[in-house]
C-alpha cells in the first residue's frame, strides 16, 4: 500500500513535469486578475466575476428562495398564532410571571406625577383638590358603558364567564358610593375634607377569593368579614400614623364583592372595587396609610408590599398664599 510520503513525492513530480511541458510548448502562465478587472472585465464580459446571464440566474434563484423562505415563516407563524387565545394568556397562575397573588392599587393617582403616592390638598383652595376629583371622574367613567353587561342579583356571579362564551359579565353598581357621600356629586369627599380613596385588586386571569376557614379570620377584620368577599383594612403605617389616622369607613363594609370574580379579558368586564372614606383625617399633618386586602389566598409581605398598598394623606386647612404680582 502506497504511503503518504510516497504519494506526496509522486504529486510533486507530476506538477513539475506539467509545468515544464507548458513552458516547452510556449504557454505563458496566466496573469493574476486585477481589482479593476474583477469589477469589470471587458474581454470576458463579466461584472464582479459574473456574466449577465449568470447574474440573471442567481437573481432569479434568490427571489424564488426568499419567497419560499417567507412563505415558510408566515405559515409557521400562522400555525403558532392559531394555538393562542387572545382572551387568556397561554401560561398563568402559580409558577408563572403573572403569579397567583393579586397586587393592591388605589385611586386617585395623578398621572402628572406618577412616582408620587402623596394625596395632598388644601380645603380652602379648590384648585388643589380638583385634579383628584377629575382623576376619579375619569376612572369611574369606564363604568358608564353598560353594553354587553347584565344586572346581577345577590345570587348571581361571573362564574360562568370562563366556560360560557355567551355569558355576560355582571354590571358593577356605583350607587352604594353615592349613598355614602363618596360619589361625584360630593366631589368624592375632597371638598369637605373627608376624602374617599378607591382600593382595588390587580386583574389576574382566573383568580377568585378563597374564604377563611372557621376561626382563621384575622382579628383586625373579624367584625366586618363576609364569606365571598375581599375585606379591606386600612390603618396607619407607624404608631404616629395609627394615632392620627382617625375614623375610617369602608364602602361596602365587607370590602370587594367576590361575586364579580373571576376576571376574564372582556372589553365589557367591570372591575369590582371598594372605597375607603377618611372621616376624621387630621388637618396639616402627614399621615401614611397602609391598606391590606384580606382573603385566604392573599399573602402579605411588607418588604415586597405584596397584598397591600401605601399612600400618604396630607389635608391642609389654611388660606392659600397669593401669587406674587408680575
Curated annotation (Swiss-Prot):
Residues 1-59 are cytoplasmic. Glycans are attached at residues 144, 147. It holds the Pfam family Na_K-ATPase. GO terms for cellular component: sodium:potassium-exchanging ATPase complex. It is a single-pass type II membrane protein. GO terms for molecular function: ATPase activator activity. The chain crosses the membrane at residues 60-80. Its main location: membrane. InterPro entries: Na/K_ATPase_sub_beta, Na/K_ATPase_sub_beta_sf. Disulfide bonds join 234-291. Residues 81-326 are lumenal. It is found in: Cell membrane. It comes from the Eukaryota. PROSITE patterns: ATPASE_NA_K_BETA_1 (PS00390). One of its GO terms (biological process) is intracellular sodium ion homeostasis. The sodium/potassium-transporting ATPase is composed of a catalytic alpha subunit, an auxiliary non-catalytic beta subunit and an additional regulatory subunit. This is the non-catalytic component of the active enzyme, which catalyzes the hydrolysis of ATP coupled with the exchange of Na(+) and K(+) ions across the plasma membrane. The beta subunit regulates, through assembly of alpha/beta heterodimers, the number of sodium pumps transported to the plasma membrane. Implicated in genomic response to various soil bacteria that affects fitness, lifespan and brood size. Belongs to the X(+)/potassium ATPases subunit beta family. This is Probable sodium/potassium-transporting ATPase subunit beta-3. It comes from Caenorhabditis briggsae. The lineage of its organism: Eukaryota, Metazoa, Ecdysozoa, Nematoda, Chromadorea.
Amino acid at each position: 500500500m502506497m504511503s503518504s510520503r510516497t504519494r506526496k513525492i509522486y504529486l510533486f513530480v507530476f506538477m513539475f513535469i506539467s509545468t515544464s511541458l507548458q513552458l516547452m510548448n510556449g504557454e505563458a502562465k496566466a496573469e493574476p486578475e486585477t481589482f479593476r478587472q474583477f469589477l469589470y472585465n471587458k474581454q470576458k464580459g463579466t461584472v464582479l466575476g459574473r456574466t449577465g446571464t449568470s447574474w440573471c440566474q442567481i437573481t432569479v434563484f434568490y427571489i424564488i428562495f426568499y419567497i419560499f423562505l417567507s412563505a415558510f415563516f408566515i405559515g409557521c407563524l400562522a400555525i403558532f398564532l392559531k394555538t393562542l387565545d387572545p382572551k387568556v394568556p397561554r401560561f398563568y397562575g402559580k409558577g408563572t410571571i403573572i403569579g397567583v397573588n393579586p397586587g393592591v392599587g388605589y385611586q386617585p393617582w395623578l398621572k402628572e406625577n406618577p412616582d408620587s403616592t402623596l394625596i395632598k390638598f388644601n380645603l380652602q383652595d379648590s384648585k388643589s383638590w380638583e385634579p383628584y376629583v377629575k382623576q376619579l371622574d375619569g376612572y369611574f367613567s369606564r363604568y358608564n358603558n353598560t353594553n354587553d353587561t347584565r344586572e346581577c342579583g345577590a345570587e348571581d356571579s361571573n362564574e360562568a364567564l370562563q366556560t360560557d362564551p355567551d355569558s355576560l359579565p355582571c354590571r358593577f353598581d356605583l350607587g352604594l358610593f353615592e349613598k355614602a357621600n363618596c360619589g361625584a356629586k360630593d366631589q368624592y369627599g375632597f371638598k369637605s375634607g373627608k376624602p374617599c380613596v378607591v382600593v382595588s385588586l390587580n386583574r389576574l386571569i382566573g383568580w377568585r377569593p378563597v374564604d377563611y376557614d372557621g376561626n382563621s379570620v384575622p382579628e383586625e377584620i373579624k367584625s366586618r368579614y363576609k364569606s365571598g368577599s375581599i375585606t379591606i383594612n386600612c390603618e396607619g403605617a407607624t404608631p404616629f400614623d395609627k394615632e392620627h389616622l382617625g375614623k375610617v369607613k369602608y364602602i361596602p363594609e365587607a370590602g370587594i364583592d367576590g361575586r364579580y370574580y373571576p376576571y376574564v379579558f372582556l372589553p365589557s368586564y367591570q372591575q369590582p372595587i371598594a372605597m375607603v372614606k377618611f372621616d376624621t383625617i387630621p388637618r396639616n399633618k402627614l399621615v401614611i396609610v397602609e391598606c391590606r386586602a384580606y382573603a385566604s389566598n392573599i399573602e402579605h409581605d411588607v418588604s415586597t408590599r405584596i397584598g397591600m398598598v401605601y399612600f400618604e394623606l396630607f389635608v391642609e386647612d389654611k388660606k392659600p398664599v397669593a401669587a406674587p404680582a408680575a
